[in-house]
Regions:
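Active-site pocket-lining/capping segments in soluble small-molecule metabolic enzymes
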Residues: 1-100, 104, 110-252
Length: 252
């Protein structure tokens, strides 16, 4: 959180990075640093906080850790300075043209590529990919943004400027933007991929990697994501009760 190289959203937090890494190692989970700022310049590469995080997370133990990246400048720097990482091409690139996306998938730099969510249902095009290309695709499942938005790239660039401490606020003009994120709204989005679609459509097509957005939305929404995507329906109520009755958990 609060990193110069960050993008996608502005985040703040005070959790201990070493403790987070230790927890992920305990459960065998690959960590990813989200460094998707699209407007980085040469002078930003020496940022101490971001480099310290890279030095810490590059040593992933049994699980290799990764970096989600937008800037090719940062990508080249990270490949040279921290070769232990794998790299993920960020959805903040807003690649809505399928041939542009195909070119991104074909780049050897990336283990995974996250398409713009508006390509999620482009099944005729997805069917043209080879097996190894499908292995590199990671779908963003639960985007809530307006499907017809034309300013998505500008919105991400505004976040990048904010992380750099530069002016240039973006005011979203999309329908319903003032209401903020709602999972119920995301489920009605034409690009939404629910757990049934993962199981019945995408897995049979050879796609096995999926991304859930919303890490900064608060525990209550994160709980709903985890219930929908990672918990069998018959356990939903029992899990909710356990968490609601845990008075040390800040859900709201």
């Amino acid at each position: 959180a609060d990193c110069l190289w960050g993008g996608g959203r502005v985040g703040f937090g005070d959790h201990d990075s070493a403790e987070i890494l230790a927890l992920l190692r305990e459960y065998g989970i690959s960590a990813r640093l989200t460094f998707s700022n699209s407007l980085l310049r040469e002078e930003h590469l020496s940022d101490r906080k971001c480099n310290d995080l890279c030095a810490l997370f590059e040593e992933g133990g049994d699980q290799r850790n990764g970096v989600i990246v937008h800037s090719d400048l940062l990508l080249a720097y990270l490949k040279q300075q921290y070769p232990g990482f794998y790299f993920v091409s960020s959805t903040t690139k807003v690649l809505t043209d399928f041939e542009d996306l195909r070119g991104e998938i074909d780049r050897e730099d990336f283990r995974y590529v996250v398409p713009d969510f508006r390509l999620n249902k482009a099944f005729a095009q997805w069917d043209t990919l080879t097996g190894w290309q499908r292995d590199k695709v990671e779908f963003l499942c639960n985007e809530c943004c307006f499907f017809g938005c034309r300013d998505r790239k500008q919105c991400y660039e505004a976040v990048s400027r904010k992380n750099l401490g530069e002016p240039g606020e973006h005011r979203c003009k999309a329908p319903g933007a003032a209401g903020g994120y709602r999972f119920s709204k995301a489920m009605k989005n034409p690009g939404f991929i629910g757990v049934e679609a993962v199981r019945d459509t995408y897995l049979p097509l050879g796609f096995s990697d999926f991304k859930i957005e919303g890490r900064g939305l608060g525990s209550a929404l994160l709980l709903e994501f985890l219930l929908h995507y990672m918990t069998k329906p018959e356990y939903h109520l029992a899990l909710r009760e356990e968490l609601y009755l845990e008075n040390t958990l800040d859900l709201f």
